[in-house]
Regions:
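Membrane-interface "cap" regions at the ends of multi-pass membrane proteins
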Residues: 1-28, 32-36, 48, 134, ...
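Transmembrane alpha-helical segments of multi-pass small-molecule transport proteins
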Residues: 12-16, 82-87, 108-130, 144-154, ...
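Extracellular loop-to-transmembrane helix junctions
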Residues: 27-56, 78-80, 367, 371
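Juxtamembrane transmembrane-helix boundary signature
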Residues: 42-74, 81-87, 380-386
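Hydrophobic transmembrane alpha-helices that form the core helical bundles
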Residues: 78-111, 257-273
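Hydrophobic alpha-helical segments and their helix-loop junctions in multi-pass secondary transporters
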Residues: 111, 128, 135, 144-170, ...
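Membrane-interface loop-to-helix entry segments
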Residues: 115-157, 167-168, 205-212, 307-319, ...
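C-terminal membrane-solvent junction of multi-pass transporters and transport-like membrane proteins
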Residues: 319-390
Length: 390
């Protein structure tokens, strides 16, 4: 089997991080002001990327897909449950990314949002058809172009240097941290789909984590800077006013395609976990078509509640996986259902939703994960028999 290098994995996650969704999420941080906003972005990404790293390392060391690693901790039924939720969130992400990309490109060249949805959807289909292992030269060209164009965009946003907005209290620091955690958290059910095929699992996971973390912070910073220094939250409009033209189109289309490809591709892999009869590549193509249709038909302008929902589902899930694999070192399959871990996950999910009503400076994810990990350790010490397959 052809293995991927650490450099290739880094390129994949560079493409994932450069996205309109990340820039748009960054605009939400403007009410904090530049210094507090930057601190919230950095703190949130440190928390989120730590989980991202451990999730990827489990896949790299076991050679299992993301949902395969979930089965190690939750059993077959648990795997099916999270695989179904993951497919749903990835269909959602595919729709959101195509919607945002089409809306932005239509600002640059107004031929109709639905036309751009079809163009972007078609390019994602092409990416899937080429395949993750054959994207080498295509990815290198796309990433080089995105890197240069992102620098240009950064210069355009920050060259004014004078804030056009005044900080206010509409967003708390803790809520901002949670928005920063949410983006790397949303990739947790995907990263093992790529690190499992790495030549050097640890190096590839570290490369993926550092690349994604740094570039994602950069995208958030561009979004926040745009809102603070230009008073404009529409990145496409900023690029049009700066006269970027074709460069703007390239940024918007390439960033959308390279990110959304990962969503659709991993949706296909997760779908394979639901049934052996499902072909991952065909499933990914179907997800892309569904995402394109949804992007044409439905408005998707505010994704904050979607991000919080992802956090409440996957933060306690990865907390249990980390505890199982690295602390308790429980290896092997869990049969149909690991009842102990399933109950702990439900408690972790409920706790996250409760914590959403509490303003915590470090956000909800960190305390929720700490509590879930502690509950997991205690539960397996008190009820070792219940940890066996049900």
């Amino acid at each position: 089997m052809k293995k991927t290098s650490s450099f290739q994995n880094g390129l994949i996650w560079f493409g994932a991080a450069v996205s309109i969704a990340e820039i748009l999420t960054g605009t939400y941080f403007a009410p904090l002001g530049f210094t507090k906003g930057l601190l919230a972005i950095l703190l949130g990404h440190v928390i989120g990327c730590a989980m991202f790293f451990f999730a990827g390392l489990i896949g790299g060391r076991t050679g299992l897909s993301a949902m395969g690693t979930v089965e190690l901790s939750f059993g077959r039924i648990g795997c099916l449950f999270f695989a179904a939720l993951n497919v749903l969130q990835l269909v959602g992400w595919t729709s959101i990314m195509i919607y945002d990309g089409a809306l932005a490109t239509n600002t640059v060249l107004g031929i109709g949002k639905w036309v751009w949805c079809l163009v972007i959807g078609g390019l994602i289909v092409l990416w899937i058809a080429i395949g993750i292992k054959n994207l080498g030269w295509v990815n290198k060209i796309a990433m080089a172009a995105l890197f240069i164009l992102s620098i240009v965009l950064c210069v355009v946003v920050f060259r004014g240097g004078t804030p056009a907005t005044v900080p206010d209290d509409s967003l708390s620091f803790g809520a901002a941290v949670e928005l920063a955690v949410a983006m790397p958290l949303s990739w947790l059910p995907l990263i093992s789909d790529y690190t499992r095929e790495a030549e050097k699992p640890f190096a590839a996971t570290l490369s993926s984590t550092l690349t994604y973390g740094v570039v994602s912070c950069w995208m958030y910073l561009i979004g926040m800077g745009a809102a603070i220094f230009t008073g404009e939250g529409d990145i496409a409009l900023i690029m049009v006013k700066a006269g970027l033209g074709v460069a703007a189109l390239l940024i918007l289309i390439l960033s959308t395609v390279t990110t959304t490809f990962l969503d659709a591709y991993s949706a296909g892999i997760s779908a394979e976990s639901l049934s052996k009869k499902i072909n991952g590549k065909y499933a990914a193509l179907i997800v892309t078509v569904i995402g394109t249709v949804c992007a044409i038909c439905f408005p998707m302008d505010d994704i904050t509640n979607f991000l919080y929902l992802i956090g409440s589902v996957f933060a306690p899930m990865i907390a249990i996986q980390i505890t199982d694999f690295f602390l308790l070192r429980r290896g092997g399959a869990r049969g149909k259902l690991d009842v102990c871990n399933a109950v702990v996950w439900v408690l972790g999910f409920v706790l996250y939703r409760v914590l959403m009503n509490v303003d915590i400076p470090v956000g909800n994810t960190l305390p929720d994960m700490a509590a879930t990990m502690l509950l997991c350790v205690i539960a397996h010490k008190l009820f070792p028999d219940k940890a066996r397959a049900a």
